[in-house]
Amino acid sequence: MKRWEIIFAAVGLLFLALGVRWIHVAELPKQETWLDAGGCHTPITILEPPAGVQPAGSVVVLHGLSANRRLMMYLAEDFAGHGLRAFAIDLPGHGDSKDAFSFARAQRCATAAVESLIRSGTIDPKKTILLGHSMGGAIAIRMADRDPLAATIALSPAPMTMPQRMPANLLVFSAGADLDVLKRTAQDLSAAAGGARTASDDFAQQRAFDLQTVPYSTHTSLLSDHRVAHQSELWAMRALFPNIAADTLTLNLDLATYETFGNGRRRLAGAIFGLLGILALFPAAVALVAKFSGPAQIESPGTRPTATLLLTEGAACAMAAVLLLMLGVPLHFLHLYAGAYLASVLLIVGILLLLLNFGFAMEYATFNGKRCAAAAFLGFATILAIGAWLNWQLDDAWLNAPRWLRFAGLLPVAWIFAFTEEAVLGPPRHGKQRAARFAIFLSLRLEIFLACLLAYYLLASGQVLIVILFVYLALFSILQRLATDALRVRTGSATAAALFSAILAAWFISTVFPLT
C-alpha cells in the first residue's frame, strides 16, 4: 500500500469519527413507523422537538419525484429543532415504500396519510404546516381542496392543475437556476393568489401569500439551503402566532432550541464529513482487494478509434437509441419510472458502440476468476458501505427487496455498457493522456444525456426526471469513473473493471428511480 493511500485512509477515519460525533451531538428524538391508510403502506419518520420543549405545532413533509423522506431530513430536523413535531413520509415507489408509484397514487396516499393523522388526533389541522418539494409541493397545494391546514410551504412546486381554492397562508420558493417550466408554475401561483400579502392581518385571516426567489440555488439545493429553512420556519410561526410581531418571531428563531440544545446545523455537516471519510478510505480498499487478486496484468491495446471518431460514434449511437425507444422501452419490465428508459438507452448505446468497435474490443474480453471475484467483492462492499451511511443520514440508498430484484435485472445490462466503455476508452495512462481519456469519457456521457434531453424536448419522450437529475448523474459518473480507473490500474483487467462499474451503475439506477 502506498504512503498516500495510508494518509487518505487515516484522514477518512478521522472524518468518519468527526461525522459520527457531530451527528450524535445534533440528534433529536426520532421514531420510525408505518402508516396504513387509504390502501397505502406508508413509511413515516416522526421527529420530536428537544427534550423539555412543548411542540408549538406540527409540520408534514412531502418529498419530490425520485426523492424520499431522508432527503428531506435537513428541513424536517430544523423544524423539529425549532419546536414543531415533524412527520416525513415516503410516497409510493420511493424510499422504503414498496407500493407502486403513479402521480395519482402519490396524491392519494399523501392525502390519506394526513387525514389519518388528523383523525387519530396525532396532529391538529389548525396547528399543522404542510411542506412539499417539487412533486410534493404540488401535492401539498392541491390538498387544500380537501384538508385545509394552518399553512402550506411549496419548494419549487411541479406543474399542476390549479386547486379550486388557494391554500391558507401559502409560501412558494423558486430556485434561481430552476427549470423554466417550474419558474412559470411559481409565477402562475403568484398570479392566482393576487400577489404578495404578508401583513399580520393576512396571516390571521389565512390569506397570506408570498413568492420568494432564492438566488444561486438549484431545484434540489433548496432542500439544504439555510435561507429556505429559516424563511419557512418564520412563515410557519407567523401562521401559528399571527398576533406576535414578525421581528419578535425572527429573534426567537435565531435563539431557538435547536442551536441551544442540539447544535443542529452540525448534523448535515457531520453526515457530509462521514461520506467524505468513506470515499477517502476507498483507495486503501482498492489496494487491498487488488493485492488479493494478484499482480496486475499488462494491457497492450491494439488500434483504437481516434477521439473524434469515437465521439462521433457515441453521438450517433445515443441518438439512435432515443429514436429506437420511440417504438417502445425494451426494459419496461423493470418497472422503474424513467430508470427503465435510461437503462434501455445505455443498453442500446452499449450494443451499437460494441458492434462498431468489435475487433479491438475483444482484445479486452479476457476472463480471470480471481480478478472478477475481487471486483465483485469491492463493488458490493462499496454500495453497502455508502448505501448504509446515506441511508442513515442523507438519502435512502439501501436497497429493499423490490429494489434488489431491479438491481439483479439491471446488472447484466449495465455490464454490457460498462465493458463497451472500458474497451473504447482503453487502459488508464498517466499525465495528459489520462486527462484526455477522462475528457473523452465525460464527453461520451454528456452525449447520452443530451440525447435524452433532445428526446424530452423534441420527441416528447416524457422523461423529465432524467433532465432533473442531471447534477446527480454527472456527479455519479465522475465518481464512478475515478473508482473504476483505480481498480483497473491495479488489476489490468477491463472485464473486472467493467463488473465493478456495472455494480455501481445498477445500484444507482435501482436506488434513485421510483418503483412502478
Regions found by a protein language model. Give the residues of each.
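Hydrophobic membrane-insertion alpha-helices, especially the h-region
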Residues: 5-20
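Early transmembrane alpha-helices of polytopic membrane proteins
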Residues: 223-226, 265-288, 313-327, 346-352, ...
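Alpha-helical transmembrane segments
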Residues: 13-17, 279-283, 415-419, 477
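N-terminal membrane topogenic signal
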Residues: 1-7, 308
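Alpha-helical transmembrane segments of integral membrane proteins
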Residues: 315-516
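Membrane-interface capping segments at transmembrane-helix boundaries
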Residues: 23, 289-293, 485-492
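Soluble extramembrane regions of membrane proteins in the secretory/endomembrane system
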Residues: 22-261
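Cytosolic-side membrane-insertion boundary helix
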Residues: 246-283, 287-310
